[in-house]
Amino acid sequence: RHTVGEGDSPDALTLAPSVAHDLPELGVMLPYTPLQHLLLAAAASHDMHALVMTSGNLSEEPIETDDGLAWEHLIAAGIADALLGNDRAILSRYDDSVVRVVDGTVMPVRRARGYAPQPLPLPALNGTAPCVLACGPQQKATIAFTREDANGEAACFVSQHIGDVENGGTFDAWNAARTRLEDLFDLAPAALACDLHPSYLSGQWAREQARKCNLPLVEVQHHHAHIASAMAEAIVAGRLALDARVLGIAFDGTGAGTDGTIWGCLLYTSPSPR
């Protein structure tokens, strides 16, 4: 452990060559609980120079919230050597948030602990925003819904980062996050939105729920969703007029296309984000 002070030379902080050796940037994790301060202090007193911080879960599985299951899945499996528990139950899984500082502005990359479900303002929809539950994609999934905030203004409430909804365990975590949002905000969705891909678990749930509850369902093409979200962000920031004509270009892997084939990118023109 070494503290770098103002005025120190760049050589004051040295890292092992194996740490992010091919990356131009480093991430910094701040201790956000008193327990982490105690762990860091104990490590320093025992001349431990490094601690590995990672989420408590198996690969492709949700974070463990139950001590018994954590013991079974993490300790018995050899992932960890010991388990430090607490007498307070964990109600909701939250990963560490990840942010970047761009031109002096903090830009969230992964909104989770400390950020979600903080609302994002949608002033262009004031007075016209129905309660729409958006079920998210399959990879790096979140859930979102639109409704009025405490001040009566239109807003989008985004869940914590959930991860890749590809199996029963992660779908259960997705479902738990959705249920918690609905209970917390007393939601009564007037419509549902999901990814166009027919095999995504979140989309399958949305289609079945829309059928059972006789709700409108909007199926959104994957790349189109990226372009629309970038447009909405620019409108909220005042950089784009609501009726501006836009050429959107999205390169983000593959996604189900409106013609039934798999698309790799999308060039899209729109008279407005609506």
Enumerate the language-model features and the residues they cover:
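Short hydrophobic/aromatic-enriched beta-strand-loop microsegments
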Residues: 51, 216-221
